């Protein structure tokens, strides 16, 4: 079973993401912000993927990804954002961006592509 960390500061959006992933058979750990998510990355060595909002309080998604990659350089990251032009920084290779709003099927398809690309 794939274990995914879902990071989203808007509770209703986070619930939708968690339910979508769980219904698809994934194990899901959730966090309301980047700081909480980073603590989970440190404590959970078997994470397969991070799905994170870009703009959040305390720590944005790009910072979360950079710090998480210091711990787990191979950990894939899928960014979600409602802001056009949010490109993945060059120092986060292999990460992808999913534009909000998105259909749950689009989220699952993006995750499938990222998981299939893992070594």
Question: What do these predicted ranges mean?
Answer:
Residues 53:
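Active-site residues of response regulator receiver
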Residues 5, 30-49:
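Acidic, metal-coordinating helix/loop segments flanking the phosphotransfer/catalytic sites
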Residues 15-23:
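Charged docking surfaces used in two-component/phosphorelay signaling
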Residues 56:
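Receiver (REC) domain active-site loop signature in two-component systems and cognate sites
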Residues 18, 102-115:
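C-terminal output helix
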Residues 80-81:
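Hydrophobic/aromatic residues positioned on beta-strands within the core alpha/beta folds
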Residues 33-36, 59-64:
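Acidic catalytic/metal-coordinating carboxylates
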Residues 8:
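Conserved acidic carboxylate
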